[in-house]
From Swiss-Prot:
Homology family: Belongs to the complex I subunit 2 family.
Main location: membrane
GN (gene name): nuoN
Transmembrane segment boundaries: 32-52, 57-77, 97-117, 126-146, 151-171, 186-206, 231-251, 264-284, 296-316, 324-344, 348-368, 392-412, 431-451, 473-493
Enzyme nomenclature, EC number: 7.1.1.-
InterPro entries membership: NADH-Q_OxRdtase_suN/2 (IPR010096), ND/Mrp_TM (IPR001750)
Reactions the enzyme catalyzes: a quinone + NADH + 5 H(+)(in) = a quinol + NAD(+) + 4 H(+)(out)
Record-given protein name: NADH-quinone oxidoreductase subunit N
Superkingdom of source: Bacteria
Organism name: Leptospira interrogans serogroup Icterohaemorrhagiae serovar Lai (strain 56601)
Membrane topology: Multi-pass membrane protein
A cellular-component GO term for this protein: plasma membrane
């Protein structure tokens, strides 16, 4: 036997790797152009921060904004360049309408975060330029999570995002609470990564492939292959549930949200959550079996229902607004995952877009208000309307949208999602519909408390007494754009228009 005959090792598939050319061509590279721009830009920023050791790293800040804008444009270019659902890198990468919109969400949220954060870093005396490269690397991981069609690639991309977030949360090294939040998130995040890796191993054991479509095919087969695939998928979904912060895998969320710098919290609540939910959505669009009354509908459905109830009940008693938004994000994740369990795609995507903008806007205002106090609570914002009426109006618009009050975008996002659930006749979807409507009504209480505190309280809060910081250009721009999207901009992206616009851009021949 020839020991150098690689064909005797079919399990490792080394012969194919060695004998076939794996050099990517230009179309392959262009298919991941947004990720390439972000990754290359992150490395360039690290080099730039060494060359220009200015105290406030102004050059690094502006160059990072330029790179994010280039990445945003690269998403459109990639969509025009590869119309329709295209596969690249031997099926490892897929450019689709879904990945197009998700990538726009991630990069938009990163741009908003980069605009908000400079003055926050200055106020906390954080003089580390690494913040901006880490932001780019985390966003790069999100884009690869969305376009990746191989479990190994998806896992590596998810870990790239997670590791960057661990560091970003602990950026305020002098704050012990921030370090505690980092440790909790890191330990539980590592635990969830173990679940995902074990799930991938079982999926590979049942199918012999790590390609997502191929690995899920044994779900329809009886015997050990089907059982391996089922165990693997359950473990993988469990790991993703940690990242989404679904109940009961949510324990890291309140402390991580409160301990991190507020712009980082906003980025986690929007881009990172959208990336994890987007991964689950893509996974469920590739299931080779119907969802009606199946185990794969009940599993995320139960997690979604428990998340709605738990998140809203715990948010009721929170005084700190960041912790309240943390529990609120658990509830909102429940609403979105309820749609995924019902096989709904377009309404889930619309909900993610609207939620991202209203959440980012709320955190942008909290970041601004924190300049007058250590923590923003219900008591510290009392009588805010008397001192800063525009700020009080803006923050209440975002909270009313999060609560689902018409005519704001959050109301329509919930309405479209609940309408789709109502059209289904399955028991699980009916339960989720009742749970969603009931919990939305429950959420009104703690969101309306903000309006009462800011406009109707006779007491004067700490922020009303001490806050004298001027509006920054970055925060003002982000808040105004988010207000526009939440108030009227959502109309352009309603379900029916959303995928149609995506298909229109993907089918355009302007760059071909």
């Amino acid at each position: 036997m020839n020991l150098f005959d690689l064909s005797i090792l079919p399990f490792l598939n080394l012969a194919q790797v060695v004998n076939e050319s794996r050099v990517p061509n230009v179309p392959d590279l262009l298919s991941v152009l947004p990720a390439l721009v972000l990754a290359t830009g992150g490395v360039f920023l690290i080099c730039l921060s060494v060359l220009f050791k200015t105290k406030e790293f102004i050059i690094v800040r502006y160059v990072s904004g330029l790179i994010l804008l280039l990445a945003f444009a690269a998403v459109f270019y990639t969509s025009f360049r590869f119309p329709g659902n295209g596969f690249h890198f031997s099926g490892q990468i897929e450019n689709s309408v879904l990945s197009f919109w998700l990538n726009l969400i991630y990069i938009s949220m990163a741009i908003g975060t980069a605009a908000i954060v400079p003055r926050i870093l200055k106020n906390h005396k954080i003089e580390f330029p690494e913040f901006y490269p880490l932001l780019l690397f985390a966003t790069c991981g999100m884009t690869l999570m969305t376009t990746g069609q191989d479990f190994i690639l998806v896992f590596v991309a998810l870990e790239l995002m997670s590791i960057c977030l661990y560091i970003l949360i602990g950026m305020a090294r002098s704050d012990l609470f921030s370090l505690e939040a980092t440790l909790k998130y890191f330990l539980l995040g590592s635990f969830s990564s173990g679940f995902m890796l074990m799930g991938i191993a079982f999926l590979f054991g049942g199918s012999g492939s790590t390609n997502i479509t191929e690995a899920l095919k044994p779900l329809t087969i009886a015997g050990y292959q089907g059982n391996f695939a089922k165990i693997g998928l359950v473990l993988f979904i469990t790991g993703v549930a940690f990242k989404i912060a679904l109940f009961p895998y949510h324990a890291w969320t309140p402390d991580a949200y409160e301990g991190a710098l507020t712009p980082v919290t906003g980025y986690m609540s929007t881009a990172a959550k959208a990336a994890s939910i987007g991964l689950l959505l893509i996974l469920y669009t590739k299931l080779p079996l119907p969802l009606e009354n199946s185990t794969w509908a009940w599993l995320p459905g139960i997690l979604a229902l428990c998340s709605m109830i738990y998140g809203n009940l715990l948010a009721l008693k929170q005084e700190n607004l960041k912790r309240m938004l943390a529990y609120s994000s658990i509830a909102h994740a429940g609403y979105v995952v309820a749609g995924i369990s019902a096989g709904i795609k377009e309404e889930v995507l619309f909900y993610l877009i609207v939620y991202s903008f209203m959440s980012l806007g709320a955190f942008a205002i909290l970041a601004y208000l924190e300049e007058g106090t250590r923590q923003v609570t219900f008591f510290s914002v009392q009588s805010l309307s008397g001192v800063k009426p525009l700020t009080a109006i803006a923050i209440n618009i975002f909270f009313m949208s999060l609560a689902g009050v018409p005519p704001f975008g959050g109301f329509w996002a919930k309405l479209f999602l609940f309408q789709k659930l109502a059209e289904s006749e399955t028991l699980m979807n009916r339960i989720l519909l009742i749970g969603g409507v009931t919990n939305s009504a429950l959420a009104l209480y703690y969101y309306l408390r903000i309006g009462i505190a800011t406009f109707m309280s006779s007491d004067e809060g700490e922020i009303s007494r001490n806050h004298a910081a001027p509006y920054s250009v970055g925060v003002t721009g982000v808040v105004l754009f988010c207000l526009l999207m939440v108030s009227v901009g959502w109309f352009l992206l309603v379900p029916g228009n959303l995928l149609a616009l995506g298909e229109l851009w993907l089918s355009s021949s302007i760059f071909r």
